[in-house]
């Protein structure tokens, strides 16, 4: 019980730190990220379960730490000008996106579903760039690599006799409407 309570504090701290880091990277104002994070922490805009779930130290809430970087790196990729698509920085951004997205799948399928919905929304927002052949090809290859990174260890373990995560079955049943 003590370990779960301690992990709760670490988990909540990292979720808020990742949120602050993403806002600092996306906002031009030096004060807006702090205000946004404080409003999220102190404001109670949704039901109490929205915030209390982070106290449970469940794997799906821990996976939320990696949803935010997935969103950030995808936005950064689409903000890159076409002339800079072949630079090392862009490859690093795509690599970080692949790692963050694959970690959501490796931890819990719940976070992957949220990250996937966010990615669909971002692609819709950057529709013209998303449909551009250069951007589309790069993001699709990165997406395939990120899923492969997460599924490969699970597949090896499954072949070795370890059953798959319960979250995969749950997530697929939610997607299929069951």
How should these model regions be labeled?
Residues 7-81, 89-126:
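Membrane-embedded helix bundles of polyisoprenyl
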Residues 54, 58, 63, 102-178:
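Transmembrane catalytic cores of multi-pass membrane glycosyltransferases
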Residues 87-90, 132:
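A diffuse structural propensity rather than consistent per-protein peaks
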